């Protein structure tokens, strides 16, 4: 072989190696929560396809169930093998603030600041977090969508029990008694079915349980932290409010008004019980319950009869509503949870990761993604809330009305240690103390407050 031939092969080999390396650098690893239904995932896939076509970057997408996302991400952080971009429905509740504090997240201010004015109040602010390693606050996450608490009930089950929607009380105590003391026994007597008045999430491994409980707490006007994140748990009014909320919440189980299994429910389980008509009503932090039937109605793989029944369920038989008035008679208050994605400080391809996040948060890309969830998530941008989508049916109008009336934020947006409180789920553990260990409500609250002080003080 001639020297020139050898040189040519060496050059060719070097170019091939360089090309392979360059190609490898143009891959982006993305981890994402799997959607509740097909249309939600399809909307994500479409956004990814558009980004790939625009950028030439190949996205390697991995999707996981909501309950698996945090364990998998924590394991990746420990192993030093993090994805470039990650999103989970419960990051905001349990880990985003802690990761920011520990210096594990990339500063996204260059992406967020130029478009800050397009976001609704109490949305982008929740991603402005303290990094104790860098000793600064910055935008360490990106907001995608938000949720709040709703009531869902079966109109036909209510009617079968002999009641109309106009008979549903608006007062706090009367409202919960109505489903437990009137609807449940009447429905069982009329139908012979052992259905329950309420689906009441109480599982320690469920974000629904603490979101629902905190909504009860809000109606008792309890504030656990001030605007600077300082604990207010030594205020006697806080303890009394928590006692009222915990008693009301656990009384539903004590009266036999929720399935016994609800003490160990995970996030999808109250949905499943509702869809099976095991429960007449449930509270849920999105309208995924109603939207599931809309997704079925649009599912070409189902029979015409199944699709017709799904459409009837969505249009006629399921109602989305707000909570009753507070115990003091004032209007209910709703806390919004802003769903956050992150880029890790240890990500291998941060430049392309930031390009993807910037692309996804553009109005033309974010809005179709949010609407792909069929109303399960509410927008974080002002313009998206004005679209006809949110006036298209009674479920979406109800969601829109709740958000436009104004919402409040979670404690972890002011004190990151409440992500640890929520991750430990001291709220559901207090429920368990009352229900399973038979301790008085006041004792369970005292123990809960002591634990909150130990974690977040």
What are these regions (language model features)?
Residues 26-29, 46-126, 159-162, 167-170, ...:
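Extracytoplasmic "Venus flytrap"/periplasmic binding protein-like
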Residues 25, 49, 54, 79, ...:
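Extracytoplasmic/periplasmic substrate-recognition and gating elements
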Residues 176-184, 227-263, 319, 323:
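Glycine-centered hinge/linker elements that transmit conformational signals in sensory
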Residues 122, 126, 134, 312-323, ...:
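Long, aromatic- and glycine/proline-rich binding clefts that accommodate carbohydrate-like moieties
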Residues 131-144, 149, 173-232:
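Extracytoplasmic/periplasmic solute-binding protein
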Residues 107-122, 168, 188, 196-204, ...:
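Short, solvent-exposed loop/beta-turn-alpha elements that line the ligand-binding surface or hinge
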């Amino acid at each position: 072989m001639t020297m020139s031939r050898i040189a040519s092969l060496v050059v060719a080999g070097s170019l091939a190696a360089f090309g392979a390396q360059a190609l490898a650098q143009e891959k982006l690893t993305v981890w994402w929560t799997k959607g509740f239904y097909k249309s939600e995932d399809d909307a994500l896939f479409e956004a990814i396809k558009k980004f790939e076509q625009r950028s030439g970057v190949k996205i390697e997408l991995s999707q996981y169930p909501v309950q698996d996302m945090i364990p998998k991400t924590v394991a990746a952080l420990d192993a030093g093998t993090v994805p470039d971009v990650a999103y989970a429905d419960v990051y905001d509740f349990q880990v985003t603030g802690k990761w920011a504090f520990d210096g594990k997240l990339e500063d996204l201010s260059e992406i967020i600041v130029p478009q800050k004015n397009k976001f609704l109040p109490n949305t982008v602010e929740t991603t402005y977090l303290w990094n104790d390693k860098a000793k600064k606050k910055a935008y360490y996450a990106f907001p995608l969508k938000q949720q709040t608490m709703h009531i869902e009930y079966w109109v036909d089950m209510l009617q079968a029990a002999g009641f109309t929607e106009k008979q549903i009380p608006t007062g706090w105590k009367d409202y919960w008694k109505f489903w437990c003391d009137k609807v449940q026994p009447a429905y069982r007597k009329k139908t012979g079915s052992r259905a329950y008045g309420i689906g009441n999430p109480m599982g320690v491994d469920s974000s629904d349980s603490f979101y629902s409980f905190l909504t009860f707490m809000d109606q008792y006007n309890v504030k656990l932290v001030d605007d600077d994140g300082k604990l207010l748990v030594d205020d006697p009014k806080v303890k009394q409010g928590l006692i009222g909320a915990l008693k009301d919440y656990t009384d539903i189980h004590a009266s036999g008004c929720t399935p016994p299994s609800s003490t160990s429910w995970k996030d999808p389980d109250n949905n499943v019980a509702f869809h099976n008509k095991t429960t007449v009503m449930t509270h849920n932090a999105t309208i995924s319950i109603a939207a599931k039937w809309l997704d079925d109605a649009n599912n070409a793989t189902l029979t015409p009869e199944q699709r017709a029944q799904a459409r009837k369920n969505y249009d006629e038989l399921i109602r989305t509503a707000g909570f009753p008035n507070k115990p003091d008679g004032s209007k209910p208050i709703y806390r919004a949870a802003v769903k956050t994605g992150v880029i890790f400080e240890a990500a291998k391809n941060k430049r392309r990761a930031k390009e993807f996040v910037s692309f996804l948060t553009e109005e033309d890309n974010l809005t179709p993604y949010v609407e792909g969830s069929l109303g399960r998530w509410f927008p974080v941008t002002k313009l998206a809330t004005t679209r006809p989508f949110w006036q298209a049916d009674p479920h979406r109008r109800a969601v829109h009305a709740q958000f436009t009336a104004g919402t409040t934020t979670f404690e972890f947006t002011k004190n990151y240690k409440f992500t640890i409180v929520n991750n430990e789920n001291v709220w559901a553990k207090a429920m368990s103390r009352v229900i399973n260990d038979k301790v008085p409500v006041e004792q369970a609250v005292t123990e809960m407050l002591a634990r909150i002080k130990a974690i977040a003080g």
